[in-house]
């Protein structure tokens, strides 16, 4: 039997609802979520006697790191340290979602834990009052890894009608997008908007503004919610920066940045000084801005070239865009358009902070 003989097994929501409202006899379900060795997410659940009032009341747990690409089989126990807590939109009630960071037995960060170093760097420069906002683009795929809603054996019409589209044939799977929006709000994610993207079956949502380490924490949790909701519809979520080769837009994680200085009167000068530093460290940034980003940063489809740093006002073909409103007001924020949709936000917010304040 090939994979093409298998149909996706959809969630049976109506049946599940018979059990979802059963009383839990005072117990609380806490789902621990972590980043694995493949830039994806894993989770497992434990039962608590009561809802914790702070993250410090949650215990350190562990998992088999050899099964997630994070540890060898002869020393596989990897520690899960809770770092952020959210309302659970799936189980509701007092149940919670717990974002956890991975550590080795000696207490040092696991090799795939980029949060630890990022948190220290952001805390070091907390006086700069840096705010981040990330635009997460993603592509919906069907069970056979074909963009969801695309014609079988063919392609949709050229790009044009799909960006912020309305109507059948112009947008696909809006119900997943709406469900994710509501779930993020319920969970406590600072989701600030959604829109259909240029390529059909591609969407975007925005998280932020967030200060400090919350940017990375909230983006990862929002991705978890998206994957879980898509499960119910038998749809896969791809964060690949160029899921379909050819004359189609790629997917990015445009990262918006402002500091106390850029938001102040005359802050455009601070923005320009930061971008001069960015130009000198372009290669270092590209190195952590996502795998396969060379397929996306071609200078076409609203991207700059991966080989050259540029910036400009209202220029979506530049590495960094200064919004028209910022140029007119003389202060505000800038948008780094280089990060791919698959980024680890801890690496991206970390290197941006490092470049602005330590170079």
Curated annotation (Swiss-Prot):
Belongs to the glutamine synthetase family. The modification Phosphothreonine is found at residue 303. Its EC number is 6.3.1.2. Keywords: ATP-binding, Cytoplasm, Ligase, Nucleotide-binding, Phosphoprotein. It is found in: Cytoplasm. It comes from the Eukaryota. Residues 114-359 form the GS catalytic domain. It catalyses: L-glutamate + NH4(+) + ATP = L-glutamine + ADP + phosphate + H(+). Residues 28-107 form the GS beta-grasp domain. This is Glutamine synthetase. Pfam families: Gln-synt_C (PF00120), Gln-synt_N (PF03951). It comes from Schizosaccharomyces pombe (strain 972 / ATCC 24843) (Fission yeast). The modification Phosphoserine is found at residues 273, 305. GO terms for biological process: ammonia assimilation cycle; glutamine biosynthetic process. Homooctamer. GO terms for cellular component: cytoplasm; cytosol; nucleus. It is an enzyme of class 6 (ligase).
